Amino acid sequence: MSNNHVGLSRRHFLKCAVVAGISCYIAPLYSRAFDVLFEEKILQAPDWNPVDKKIKFRIDGYAKVQGEKVFARDIRARDIPHWPKQQGHAFLLRVTQADKIYEGFNLERLNDGLMPDRIVTASDLEKDGVAFPEFYGEDLLLPTGKTPAYLGQAVALLIYHDFAKFSFAKETLKFHDDVIQYGAYTGPLQRDPWGTYRGVRIGGETPFSPDTYSSMKDMPISPIGMKKHLPIWPEGREGGKLDQEGMYYADELAKQLENPPEDWLVIKRKYFSQSIDTSALEPDNANGWYDAKTQSFHLVIPTQSPQEVAASLPEMLAKSKFPIKQIFLHPCFTVGYGSKDHTPFPYYGAMATLYGDGVPIRLANDRYEQFQSTIKRHAFDMDYTLAVNKKTHKIEALSASFIGDGGGRCNFTPSVVMVAATGAQAIYYIPRSDLSAVGIASRAVDAGSARGYGTLQAMAATDMIMEEAAKLLKADPIEFRLNNIIKSGMKNTQGAIPGGAIRADEVLTRCAEHPMWKERAKRKADFEAKNAGKLFGTGISCVQKDFGTGAESSFARVELTPEGKIAIYHSGAEIGTGMSTSQAVVCAKWLGKPAEEAHFSVVDWSVLPMISTGNPFAMAQDEQERLATNPLWTPNYCSPASASNSAYYFTHSTEEAARLVFEYGLWPAAMSIWQEGIGGGQAAPLVVRREDARWVANGLTADGLEVLSLQRLIDRTFEMGGLTGAVCHVFNRWEWAEADFKINDETRRLPVDGLSLRFANKDYQVWHRQKAYYPDTQRNNAGVTYYSAVATLSELAIDKATGHVELLDHHTVVECGNLIVPQLVSGQIQGGLAMGIGHALHEYLPLYEDGPGNGTWNFNRYHLPLANDVAVWKQTSEILPGLSDTDPPKGVAEVVMIPVVSSIVNAIADATGHHFLSLPVRPNDILEVLS
């Protein structure tokens, strides 16, 4: 234990970081605006039923339906008391060509009194030392004399102190190609890929035997160089270095697929999955004020990754010539579907703030600008070769290559293409595989952490080729899938064993029993008899998707108040998923009711000052062991809200903090009450075990003892000096880090790597771990170990005259452990299905000159699915019950979006007899086939 006392006052500014002499603060100022920003008014006390242990509404539910849930986009300078009342505005000029030298811009159209108060260009940034944080690459603004890296790249910022001038000027310049000046033609920039991945697995004699070669056992393969911007893989050599040996097995597999045995069916297909916009309700925006007199910098932003901004913004500003002593950062509620995770937009907002000349500056995309600049889902070209045994109908091998278009900036492209390759196996056991991926740099708009993260593209393709294989083998599509399903204890294509029971077979079996599937032939005949001009099709698809990144981490602080309330503080951000509600409810398992006071996107963790150095994905084992001797070191400081990580990973930190408060606070208090009186009180005649404790309607009981109210327990806990607050930091590299802590003379090995405790009303104390047990760095090669399985049945009709697809009905079966808040899971299912339907049939962005980078795209051209596109009144879903009440909850936000894509394409194949390979499948594509 440390004697390191940490004082904490919620009524004062809270320092969260100091970088190069700049302090970064979170500022809970209790004004109208900051009530909103810091959730004092948005989040209501949970409407909790202690009998059925269910919550009636989201804790932000009333605010949502009453229009009181204010986003960063709604905040103006006048809302923040200490800011100047004048609100300035700015917009960016962006290129619409990326094959010619940029030579400047022409603002002659603004000569009628609409010229900006300030123009910022790359030369200003260079002079003042203002540049992107390293993650985002170069050229915050493109200098003259260079070819743009991508369509829509920003070249200048125009700042106005008057809204009317700003508004007229922006409209005056919009859609005019002569504003940006271009010089000589150069062609698009040619660059090496942003990232590559290759994983080879040659399994043993059985799925449970040791592998001959795999990423987990040996290593994934990296290129030895680049030639013409394509990877050069090592030369295959049996018995050579590990990567050479891996390439030897890859070469041998390729030879066999080219010259297969007679009893193999080999299918080769090329698939394409399009670029899409995540279409977040709130476009990117920022509002900031730089006060040169006090050298303070204020910024209001929506972000899925507030900790990333809190860490990177001070570094960016510290390198500039602007004198800044302190930053006040205000991350807000938002929605992004990945587009606000590590987005460059906050740094454009910071740039605008610096050049506001003392006036708060708001930089906010309209929807045209949002299409032109926000992070997109990667387009993928996928080349598949699948071998299936004609006799056994078992998969023999899969070779697949994936090319993801990362656009003009790297962002998360290296990990997206890796996740596509590692996720391609979907629900299937594949004994031999060679899966490679390349994330190319192109002139397209940036692609990044969009929902699906490569797996939507790859898993849909895998299930589409499996559907075609079943048809060619004249096998029942569900039976064929069940015959090839991965079972518990088998290995994935990286050679790792997934965690827990694999239940994809149960999900598929439920679909096989559904009338939509059992009666599909009759339903088809009946429909087509009644609708002469239409075709009817039924489709099935099942996938299981990982959740998490392989370096998940979070902070949670759970504490009791003397007034009988429970409070939670969490590093995770609420991005519309209901995470704020679910984490409040998680507290009820150990503390009897949900947290009444809830704070999210918390960036101040001075109560547990963990530090992180190095790259958790690329760290050597000896480096990790050396760094872990520091009891406050962790491989990863904090994760953004992404990768479906709240239900499982964020819950872990919350639950561990609540568990400690129960074990060292409420439980000893309960025992002290039950043991009061002569002879050991009411507890003495009974055998009382902590594991028998149960929360019932009126409080806590165990083994037939008196029910004690929570208030009574909290009162006794404070009287006894028991534990009233715990802060936990957790880390997961496809398994949880653990550490030894000595608490009350007892050494405990806990699944946390950082801990701070508060007893009664004392200050928090950092509890230094005695020893840490981090998952080996080799476990990075596992790729994934946590899965949720989802299957979707779909019925659709196709108009033979127009090619229009009408989705008639769909049914989805989900396996996601025990639910924290069932209504939130239902909402995720419905929303994910709509997204998948859009990807399969409607949503499409051209990648290059005709695409969103030209600044002309909006929802008049981009078809988001509407209610009549998604069978809104007929769709159904079911959720498999957990195996027991100990099953952890699983992430589902992304996986529910995926199988409906391939289910629809498979249903179209059932209706037309043609297996489409490119997404989306649009009416003209169908008409070509029907004609």
Locate the predicted segments by residue.
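N-terminal secretory signal peptides
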Residues: 1-8, 12, 34-35
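Aromatic/His-enriched, Gly/Pro-containing loop or helix-boundary segments
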Residues: 126-156, 341-348, 357-359, 365-374, ...
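Flexible, low-hydrophobicity surface segments
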Residues: 30-219
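Phosphate/diphosphate-binding loops
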Residues: 359-403, 652, 656-675
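C-terminal catalytic domains of large/alpha subunits in multi-subunit enzymes
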Residues: 16, 34, 123, 319-326, ...
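Helix-loop-helix junctions that connect adjacent transmembrane helices in secondary transporters/permeases
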Residues: 209-317, 485-563, 778, 792, ...
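Thiamine diphosphate
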Residues: 328, 333-364, 372, 579-587
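Surface-exposed intrinsically disordered loops and tails
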Residues: 51, 185-257, 624-625, 677-685, ...
